[in-house]
Amino acid sequence: MKSDINQLTTEGRNPASNDLDEMSILAIAQLMNQEDAKVSQSITPELPQIAAAIALIVTAFKANGRLIYMGAGTSGRLGVLDAAECVPTFGTEPEMVQGLIAGGAQAMTVAVEGAEDNPNLGAQDLKDLALTANDAVVGLAASGRTPYVIGALDYAQKIGAATISLACNNQALISQHARVAIEVTPGPEVLAGSTRLKAGTAEKMVLNMLSTISMVKIGKVYHNLMVDVKPTNEKLVIRAKHMIELATGVSADEASELFAAAHQNVKTAIVMDLAGVSVSDAEQRLQRAHGVVRDALALQ
């Protein structure tokens, strides 16, 4: 197994950085910038697989299912990060998108020895969440071979949940354990084996697509505005009011009035103005349209 790991692209040495310790600060920064430019290129061939994965996630959401990210180390932390951002950005409940990391919450800041090597822990974490066939599980592993993730994917398959894998090596082992496999290969790292670099960036870019596009497709967005944002601080209140301006064409003062009248709900404010209806009528329309602004506006 040790020799197998050493053959992975993510573990390889990058010839461009062989003399890294002798390079100037600027030269290293330039090299890292050049290498980072390869990340988006590595994702392009996988866009069809990414789209297929998003379709599974959307189906799960429409069945009141959840999106669960599973990973260890950097991969796990990225999953937790993306899940956490869905709450303020799209107004989701914390349970709707969750990130699980091998070793539990403490592993976000401190390495938990051996946690990623036990496939049973991955399965147990999903059992503890009471995973159902309506859920979607995304297994994250830059190496493509993390036992914790494989155990989770196998359990999810057994339950009947949608399964997606994301790895940064070709022919990854976890690809054999998922319904949809995504393999992005940005190549060896500037610092050999440090997958928090290009591999981590690639994973985050894919996660951005999975969560954002899924939310677009379940009506969390109107045009390109995040109209389900939760205005939990001053910045977000300002953003919410501005979105009402942009969506309706009203003045800043009128947007503020709509925002207040709609109980600080951007969607309700937009429907009130564009459909010319009361707060209660706008709320009823949105309820009938399952929260989709365009559909609510089309109702009579």
Swiss-Prot record:
Catalytic residues identified in the record: E85 (proton donor), E116
Stored InterPro entries: Etherase_MurQ, Glucokinase_regulatory_CS, MURQ/GCKR, SIS_dom, SIS_dom_sf
CDD domains: SIS_Etherase
Keyword Lyase listed: yes
Domain of life the protein comes from: Bacteria
Alphabetic keyword roster: Carbohydrate metabolism, Lyase
Molecular function per GO: carbohydrate derivative binding; carbon-oxygen lyase activity; ether hydrolase activity
Pfam family for this entry, one: GKRP_SIS_N
GO BP terms, alphabetized: amino sugar catabolic process; N-acetylmuramic acid catabolic process; peptidoglycan turnover
Catalytic activity: N-acetyl-D-muramate 6-phosphate + H2O = N-acetyl-D-glucosamine 6-phosphate + (R)-lactate
Subunit structure: Homodimer.
Protein family per UniProt: Belongs to the GCKR-like family. MurNAc-6-P etherase subfamily.
Its job: Specifically catalyzes the cleavage of the D-lactyl ether substituent of MurNAc 6-phosphate, producing GlcNAc 6-phosphate and D-lactate.
Protein name: N-acetylmuramic acid 6-phosphate etherase 1
Organism, scientific name: Lactiplantibacillus plantarum (strain ATCC BAA-793 / NCIMB 8826 / WCFS1) (Lactobacillus plantarum)
Species classification: Bacteria, Bacillati, Bacillota, Bacilli, Lactobacillales
